[in-house]
A protein has these predicted regions:
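Charged structural interfaces that engage phosphate-rich ligands
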Residues: 83, 99-100, 111
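GIY-YIG nuclease catalytic motif and its immediate N-terminal context
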Residues: 1-42, 89-93
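Short arginine-rich
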Residues: 97-106
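Short, polar/flexible loop-turn hinges at active-site or ligand-entry regions and domain interfaces
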Residues: 86-89, 106-108
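Alpha-helical scaffold elements adjacent to nucleotide-binding pockets in ATP/GTP-utilizing enzyme cores
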Residues: 48, 93-98
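Conserved short loop/helix modules at catalytic or binding sites
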Residues: 34-87
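BZIP DNA-binding basic region
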Residues: 37-41, 106-112
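N-terminal cationic leader/targeting segments used for protein routing and processing
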Residues: 3-7, 61, 108
C-alpha cells in the first residue's frame, strides 16, 4: 500500500504583508510573501529581504526597490509586518488595497 497520498496544495496558507523602509529617507515598499519556517514571521521576512537583495544585485532591474537596494545597500533598510492574512486571494486583494491607499514610493508597478 502506498503511504504517500497526493493532496491538493493548500491555497489558504497564511500570507504576510510586510514593509521595507529606508531609515534615512523613510521611503518604503509594501510586499506580500507566504508565511514559511513553520510560522516564524521574522525568519520568513529575513529570508524575503535576502531574496530582494539577491535579485537587486543579480538581475539589475530598474524597479524602485531593486534600484535603491543597489544604490544604498541593505544595511539602510528595516522590515516588519503590516498584517497576516489567511488565503492567497484575500492577501493579494489586501496588499493591492494597502498599496493604493498608502502609495509607497518604492512600489513602482502602479497596482490599481
Amino acid at each position: 500500500m502506498n503511504s504517500k497520498i497526493n493532496r491538493k496544495r493548500r491555497t489558504d496558507r497564511n500570507q504576510v504583508i510586510y514593509y521595507i523602509q529606508d531609515v534615512e529617507t523613510l521611503e518604503y515598499y509594501v510586499g506580500l510573501t507566504a508565511l514559511s519556517f513553520k510560522g516564524n514571521v521574522f525568519r520568513t521576512l529575513r529570508r524575503r529581504m535576502q531574496k530582494h537583495m539577491q535579485r537587486a544585485l543579480a538581475e539589475n532591474k530598474n524597479w524602485g526597490l531593486s534600484r535603491v537596494l543597489r544604490e544604498r545597500g541593505a544595511e539602510r533598510f528595516i522590515f516588519g509586518v503590516i498584517e497576516v492574512v489567511r488565503g492567497k486571494r484575500p492577501a493579494h486583494a489586501r496588499e493591492t488595497e494597502l498599496i493604493n491607499t498608502m502609495q509607497p514610493a518604492l512600489n513602482t508597478f502602479g497596482v490599481k
